[in-house]
Amino acid sequence: MNQLKALFFFVLSICSLHTAAQRIKGSDTVLPVSQETAEIFMNTHPEQRVTITGGGTGVGISALMDHTTDIAMASRPIKFSEKMKLKAAGQEVKEVIIAYDALAIIVHPDNPVSRLTRQQLEGIFRGKIVNWKQVGGPDMKIIVYSRETSSGTYEFFKESVLKNKNYMSGSLSMPATGAVIQSVSQTKGAIGYVGLAYLSDRVKPIAVSYDEGKHYVLPTMENGTKRQYPVVRPLYYYYNVSDKAKVRHFIEYVLSPAGQNIIKKGGYIPVK
């Protein structure tokens, strides 16, 4: 009987070694395409298990530090302060760009304003421009929706559009991209920002100019791929080098032609 028990637990341990459970956590921007890719990956690799949750880039990187995730999804590069914490903990982290994303500026569909310069966007999100009539629209108060400070999208927008200046104190922070879409779709004076893959007919994307109004470009897959749209960013996976063997197969699949095709179909810009 003892020999049978020993054999059972030996077989169980071998099975567990071949079922590599991977935990992925972080950016809500990267979340949908990671979920879609993981589902197809597990269908073709039944020995692999992948669980994915959002929460924001900062949450994902913190989980990587705490060893409660194997891969951190991020919509911004890892910060110097985060690198120092990882280094102090003896962790060496690898960065992988898995896709690119165009960050769309959105308004309510009934808003007649269809284009804005970067300077106008900066004025709006910093609270210097407070009424749509100041940018050629109707006499209507501007309601600013943003993301929480733990969001990589929040950080990227601040860097690219606000040129690292502070957001206005009265902006409404949303916990996820879906909440931004919902809020803007229900508020006529609203403005917000979301990843290209989240766009729907519930909101209206506007054309953006980074050359003081000489050229305005809409956020589309084509314009993002050609880098004609000015607000494009990389999307990342981060993992501990010590976990490379565990995460390698999934990351290789994401970067493969099949994985990059899923990324493109999901509304993201492939790296290859």
Model-based region annotation:
Residues 1-8:
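Bacterial N-terminal signal peptides that target proteins for export
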Residues 21-272:
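Exported/periplasmic ABC-transporter solute-binding proteins
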Residues 8-20:
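Hydrophobic h-region of N-terminal signal peptides that target proteins for export
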